Amino acid sequence: MLSWNNSWHSSSTENRTMEREIVASYEPKKNNEIRMFESSDEMATDLAEYISQVSEISIKERGYFAIALSGGPLISFMRKLCEAPYNKTLDWSKWYIFWADERAVAKNHVDSYYKSTKEDFLSKVPILNGHVYSINDNVTVEDAATDYEFVIRQLVKIRTVGVSESNDCPKFDLILLSIGSDGHVASLFPNHPALELKDDWVTYITDSPVPPPERITFTLPVINSASNIAVVATGEDKAKAVYFAISDGAEGPDAPSIPARMVQPTDGKLVWFLDKASASFLEAKTKNDGYEHPKY
């Protein structure tokens, strides 16, 4: 694994040299960290340890661990939490599960994030059923968003979910996101009006550019109010989106405004988990001074 923030470390001379070059070109913003992995198994191992540490700290400080998940291949990278030592050592009774976004489909539908999360994660760990806050799939997408925000507001009142010191938004202990090839996070898509919402905690869309069209999603203020945010990216098809989300070279009037770049914690920490393919444009920039910035 390569990892860089204010310091850097690596096991091989070659990796140390490459990492030093990347640090020079991509100095992360304050409280941001980027980790790059050689394999999916290495990423899953590190992600499990990261989540375990955030969980332990949150439970020690607050008595709860409130985590919001998203969809895509993200859940598969949590698989190590279902194995020793984590399945025995984590205080699962203090975990509270939410979704940063969800598709407006039945819970048993193949497109449901709840379904995939239950099959690949929840069914394998002893999290209490009453601590799993899924979306109401028996109402319209608009009502589902309203209901979900109401539920979260009640949990903020009793501090099961924390509250931001900077605003009245919920302060989740961890929001775990993936990134789309277009740079979307949660169900916040490029140039969508939902990106401009300031007061809503949860909103809905009916025009997702990728099916299914109806979804609910956390808004940017809620995402950015989290204590910790982790974004997982894998595959070459994510490389341009990762570049435009992270790179200072992607700034300027001609740079695309992608939602992933708008993920900047107000008072928390952001960690990017990247495989080599998704980080390929970042690496290419360090190896060739004449590298032309990718274009959408």
UniProtKB/Swiss-Prot annotation:
Entry keyword annotation includes Membrane: no
Keywords: Hydrolase
GO process terms (BP): carbohydrate metabolic process; pentose-phosphate shunt
EC code: 3.1.1.31
Pfam families on file: Glucosamine_iso
Catalytic EC class: hydrolase
Superkingdom of origin: Eukaryota
SUPFAM superfamilies with a match to the protein in the record: NagB/RpiA/CoA transferase-like
Catalytic activity: 6-phospho-D-glucono-1,5-lactone + H2O = 6-phospho-D-gluconate + H(+)
Record pathway: Carbohydrate degradation; pentose phosphate pathway; D-ribulose 5-phosphate from D-glucose 6-phosphate (oxidative stage): step 2/3
Family designation: Belongs to the glucosamine/galactosamine-6-phosphate isomerase family. 6-phosphogluconolactonase subfamily.
Protein role: Hydrolysis of 6-phosphogluconolactone to 6-phosphogluconate.
Protein name: Probable 6-phosphogluconolactonase 1
Species per Swiss-Prot/TrEMBL record: Oryza sativa subsp. indica
Organism taxonomic ancestry: Eukaryota, Viridiplantae, Streptophyta, Embryophyta, Tracheophyta
